A protein has these predicted regions:
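Hydrophobic ligand-binding cavity/cleft-lining segments
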Residues: 1-45
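A short small-residue
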Residues: 10, 124-131
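Generic alpha-helical structural signal
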Residues: 18, 79, 145-149
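Hydrophobic-ligand binding "helix-grip"
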Residues: 35-36, 43, 49-50, 54, ...
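A conserved amphipathic terminal alpha-helix motif
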Residues: 84, 128-158
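Residues at helix-coil transition
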Residues: 29-30, 39, 87, 149, ...
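Hydrophobic pocket/interface hotspot
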Residues: 24, 34, 59, 82, ...
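Exposed loop/turn and edge beta-strand positions of beta-sandwich/beta-sheet ligand-binding modules
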Residues: 7, 11, 76, 107, ...
Length: 158
């Protein structure tokens, strides 16, 4: 019988934006905006992006890994289920990641938008279970850090 392993990890990423919570929240809620910062990315080509932003709604992205990645030609799929949405305050979602046809993780993520004098503090908390040699918490935190860099660029757009 094949032995199955799981590694658990939690990380928190905090960012400050010179934008209102309404604008930062919109970058998560509007499919066109989210696709620009979330679904794009260096080293892969987006093949699928579907988003239904509502409690009970789902999101699915699939990108094909490029030749300079450790898994050239392999699909990386994100399947998301929206658990809780409070406009301009928080989004809670559960998501799984697949590499090819192998599920590599399942996570619960909470994004909080806190109004400040200078704009918005975003607090991203990820609680994950990483399966059999999956990417693990450190790599996932690095991936989300890169995604939030993309969010910074999206929020700088006019």
């Amino acid at each position: 019988m094949e032995e199955r392993s799981v590694t658990h990890g939690t990380f928190v990423i905090e960012r400050s934006y010179p934008n209102t919570p309404e604008r930062v929240f919109a970058a998560f809620a509007d499919p066109g905006k989210k696709r620009r910062w979330f679904a794009g990315g260096e080293g892969s080509e987006m093949e699928e992006f579907e988003m239904n932003f509502r409690v009970g709604g789902t999101e699915r992205t699939m990108r094909r890994m490029g030749p300079a990645t450790p898994f050239p030609g392999v699909a990386l799929t994100n399947e998301t289920y929206y658990e809780d949405i409070v406009p301009n305050r928080r989004v809670v979602f559960a998501y799984t990641m697949l590499l090819g046809d192998r599920r590599i993780s399942a996570s619960l993520a909470t994004v909080e938008f806190v109004r400040t004098e200078k704009g918005t503090d975003l607090i991203f908390t990820d609680q994950g279970a990483y399966f059999e040699s999956g990417d693990g918490p450190k790599m996932r935190e690095g991936g989300w850090s890169k995604l939030l860099e993309g969010l910074t660029k999206e929020l700088a757009r006019p």
